């Protein structure tokens, strides 16, 4: 009687699935337990606690998604770009919220340049200094030694309109270049100013525009690159990458342009694309990315 040999890959996959399910279960139980004890004491429910719940909720959803893919991925094969999209959206939104404003290295310098670009868009540009709403100029953020109180201070009045919306000349100067790398973050600030949002919401919108541009560029790159899709996906999901693309840093736009140049060039040389329109679009994106980079 022949004895069938056990497939080691199947055993490894089973262990990974069980591990993911256990982590997901523990995280879900922990999140419910924390929420239950906090609800009993309404005075302890603050911005930090809400942010805490959002973070664990997003991680729970992400782990559940990865677990489902691990269990049924072989039967229903999902392309890399479709697998990447929900992961980058969840992790990107998470990093956007949990990394305090001004904490990313030199972010304050990038914020002032983006704000200056917003002034150009709104016709309030000053050649000498950055014109800002008085509320935005006076709002203080702690960039070092972040504590629970700093999170509460940052998100206090997130959805409230500021009182001091008059424009004033500040001591800040726009020094970063090339300036076109700040168009999207400046657009986010402009949207916030037009909507009359709070200072924190204003800056979060600027960050969000950088993140969305990176997501779109990386999604297109993974779709177009003929091989190495997994490497691009892992690079895009690295903590240091997410930190930069979820901030005002021009690294976000540089990362997007770099990966577009690599992917479109490799697609033009090694790709087996038969659709003429797709090839034309790929070549246009390649040339535009090279020029901007």
Q: What name fits each language-model region?
A:
Residues 247-254:
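Short acidic/glycine- and proline-prone juxtamembrane loop motifs at membrane-interface regions
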Residues 19, 197-200, 219-240:
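Transmembrane-helix signature of polytopic, membrane-embedded enzymes
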Residues 52-68, 202-227:
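Selective detector of the "anchor" transmembrane alpha-helix that sits immediately C-terminal
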Residues 185, 189, 218-222, 259-271, ...:
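Hydrophobic transmembrane alpha-helices
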Residues 120-205:
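Interfacial juxtamembrane loops and adjacent helix segments
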Residues 1-23, 28, 35, 45-93:
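Start-transfer (signal-anchor) and selected internal transmembrane alpha helices
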Residues 21-30, 67, 71-108, 115-156:
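Transmembrane signal-anchor helices characteristic of membrane glycosylation enzymes that use polyprenol
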């Amino acid at each position: 009687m022949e004895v069938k040999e056990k497939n080691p890959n199947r055993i490894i996959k089973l262990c990974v699935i069980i591990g993911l399910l256990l982590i997901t279960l523990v995280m879900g139980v922990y999140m419910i337990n924390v929420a239950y004890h906090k609800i009993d004491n309404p005075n302890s429910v603050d911005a930090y606690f809400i942010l805490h719940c959002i973070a664990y909720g997003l991680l729970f959803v992400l782990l559940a998604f990865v677990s489902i893919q691990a269990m049924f991925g072989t039967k229903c094969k999902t392309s890399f770009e479709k697998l990447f999209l929900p992961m980058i959206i969840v992790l990107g939104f998470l990093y956007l919220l949990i990394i305090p404003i001004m904490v990313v290295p030199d972010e304050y310098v990038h914020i002032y340049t983006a704000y200056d670009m917003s002034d150009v868009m709104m016709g309030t540009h000053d050649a000498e200094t950055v014109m800002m709403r008085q509320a935005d100029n006076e709002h203080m953020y702690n960039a070092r030694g972040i504590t629970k109180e700093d999170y509460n201070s940052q998100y206090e009045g997130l959805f409230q309109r500021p009182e001091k919306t008059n424009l004033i000349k500040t001591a800040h100067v726009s020094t970063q270049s090339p300036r076109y790398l700040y168009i999207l973050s400046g657009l986010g600030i402009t949207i916030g100013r037009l909507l009359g949002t709070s200072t924190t919401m204003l800056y979060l919108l600027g960050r969000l525009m950088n993140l969305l541009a990176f997501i779109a560029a990386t999604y297109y790159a993974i779709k177009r690159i003929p091989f190495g899709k997994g490497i691009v996906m892992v690079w895009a999901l690295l903590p240091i990458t997410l930190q930069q693309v979820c901030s005002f840093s021009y690294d976000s736009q540089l990362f997007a342009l770099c990966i577009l140049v690599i992917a479109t060039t490799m697609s033009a040389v090694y790709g087996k694309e038969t659709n003429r329109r797709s090839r034309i679009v790929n070549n246009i994106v390649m040339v535009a990315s090279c020029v901007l980079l």
